[in-house]
Amino acid sequence: MKRLSRLAACLLALTLTACTAAETAVPAATAPPTVAPSPTAAPTAAPQATPLPYDDLSYVPEFGFQQKQTYQPDEYNRLYLDTYSFNDRTVLVGAEDETAALLEAGRDPGLGVRSLQARGITGQGVKIAIIDQSLLTDHPEISGAIAAYCETGIDSSLNEGTLHGPAVASILAGQTVGVAPGVQVYYMATPGAADSRPHADALRHILKINETLPEGEKIRAVSVSAAPGDRDLFENADLWRDALAEAEAAGLLVLTAQGAAAGSARLTLSTSTFDLTRRDSPAACKTGLPNDSGMLAARKSSFCLGLPCAYRTVAEEYVPDQCGYRYDAVGGLSWGIPYCVGVMALGWQVAPALTNEEMLQTLLDTAAPNADGLRIIDPVHFIETLEREYAS
């Protein structure tokens, strides 16, 4: 889970600690002073530390954290600019043009996706579902793509967004930052908690929606930026596994952090990072994240696919009508999963009859090996192969 899902738990822990201390502490008896106490020196404010590479400088006042908005030139390091994560409300004095350029560059999905979009390959006519944390549906980046929005296990009265929700939706279907801006998204919001029950309920709800849709117009795939089937990370993982089996039997392709399977095809996932000087080159991508070399052993797997997970600009909205964008120098696999499902949507636009097994196998067969031997998703080669071998 990303930062906001952890934030609530952290704040709760702090609150409980403070309450417990206040309610249970018994003041010790104090003898009357016989000598006037010495004056206490006023506390000296600790010097502001310069942000380190890959620190998050986003200004998010809505939730009472990350309150610093403006950084003077001596409060950041210009050499680290492309390593910082920040949003469009962060001000780095003296580097405004550079941060604006990073935000703009991060809008590009990379790997040649924009060349496909220029040809009209946008996922038009394809229906996709997302199971993730809540979002507000009025952000112009994604509002036109949301076909339905449902909540499971969430207090709807809060009317709050999260970091995760608009980010994954915009990576998949954003109008200016997304891989497949032509898709229709059925969004199932779940709490940012390590409990698979809401995920399982959401997946079954998607199956019910599909029962109402005509043949040829059903939801094809589900993007889940989590691992609800992992018993070590999630409670009630068996509930998810049961729902997943039902979905697969119904012909729904579900991609999670644990990958996907269909017929004899199997797909596992690895993080990768754009080469900022060759953003459209899959082979130039680095294995892992910018601040982490990743699992190099993954390159030996014949069914592991590297996905771009860093240096992305994504939609951001925490309260209604406060729509913006953030630049993530370091994302994570959560950002790679909707990217991959977006590429799938492009493929189904070109080859609507493509089976789930053919989808997974073609993604692997057309991937480009990088310098480490990890096979990186190659949207252009993927689409060209489908047009040649599967398109009607």
What are the roles of these predicted feature ranges?
Residues 126, 133, 146, 152-235:
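Subtilisin-like peptidase catalytic core
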Residues 15-18:
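C-terminal motif of bacterial Sec signal peptides marking the signal peptidase cleavage site
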Residues 20-28:
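Bacterial lipoprotein signal-peptidase II cleavage site
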Residues 88, 215-225, 238, 349-392:
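C-terminal subdomain of the subtilisin-like protease fold in secreted/lumenal serine endopeptidases
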Residues 52-65, 80, 123, 191-273, ...:
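Substrate-binding/access-modulating region of protease and related hydrolase catalytic domains
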